[in-house]
Amino acid sequence: MTIIASISKIGNIKSSSSSSIGSGRNSAISFGSNKIACGECGGSSNPMGSLIGNVANTGAGKVSHIPVTVMVDASVAMNPSSMLPSGGSCGCN
């Protein structure tokens, strides 16, 4: 299941939205170290699976690594701890 999230403007990073937010294979989000790589930038599956989600494919677009504000994973309803801490926002240039 995917969730739809809107991305707020931070500095010169443009606002955007995505329907593929989450930790699945086609996710636009990569989890790890309380940061995410976000935007329609593609990615590749990660051996660690749902633990950190997909790995950003830098060849598919410019990815901005910025602390996430509140990113809710598709599994957050069953596992509230999958919500990342407050920080900032994200986007792709």
Swiss-Prot record:
Q: Name one GO biological process term.
A: sorocarp development
Q: Which Pfam families match?
A: Coiled
Annotated family: Belongs to the hssA/B family.
This protein is called HssA/B-like protein 23
Gene field: hssl23
